[in-house]
């Protein structure tokens, strides 16, 4: 009888350990699926590492930038989530969000039809990216803005049809039928090609992202700073930028939209724009840009 009691104790203890082990396994699965202590869902946010001032890693090794700061403010309005920011490459960001490695990613991205097939785009943009014309300094007296460029010659470096910039020029031509810009479609080419073609006189302007021009040409360490005394840049419009969400995160995207609207209403977005850009970039967004721009 004593021996049977001993065996019985071992069996009971074994069952207890087994049940405890099962309970521990469930907790591990919950954490990996996004559950955090306190009931908040962990949201992994990928961002690029050197796209200053939109998304970057600062001198302290911290995630920083306008879009990161906006999302940090979004986090404050959504206590049901716990945001974790992960600096990474462009490719890993897009592949990771699509695969579910990350819940969302932010990289100063424009809305595109191709990306809409892979990701959820929220209704509210997180920021804006200014574009304009790069032209020869020799023509500074004739080219003051996009309208004067159109009258000067309208000879623009070709643009890929799927590029948002193509739609921008297309929209301009619809409202300037008498002096349209010569809009020619083309396959991809390098920035170096575009700058060279403008300097050679093959074309009279190239539509570029202002931040890229500043980094490439105006900055002393820029790859094409040697062209700074030959090229100039003039602003035109701003194109909205969006975070991209994994296809399974519609609720997160909806919650993001509500929070962004609150931040706009409170003036927080404008405050952060002034901090990182020194001005409100949304003021340069045209109605067409807000509604339909593809990249």
Regions found by a protein language model. Name each.
Residues 17-21:
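C-terminal motif of bacterial Sec signal peptides marking the signal peptidase cleavage site
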Residues 24, 81-84, 160-184, 258-295:
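Ligand-binding clefts/hinges and TM-proximal coupling segments of bilobed small-molecule sensing domains
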Residues 29-109, 187:
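Extracytoplasmic small-molecule ligand-binding "clamshell" domains
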Residues 49, 127-132, 221-260, 279-295:
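Periplasmic-binding protein-like
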Residues 49-52, 61-76, 133-190, 210-212:
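Bilobed "Venus flytrap"/periplasmic-binding protein-like clamshell domains
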Residues 68-78, 137-140, 147-151, 155-158, ...:
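Extended ligand-binding regions for polar small-molecule ligands
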Residues 84-149, 234:
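Acidic, polar ligand-binding/catalytic clefts
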Residues 92, 108-118, 167-171, 199-237:
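A ligand-binding cleft/hinge motif common to bilobed small-molecule-binding domains
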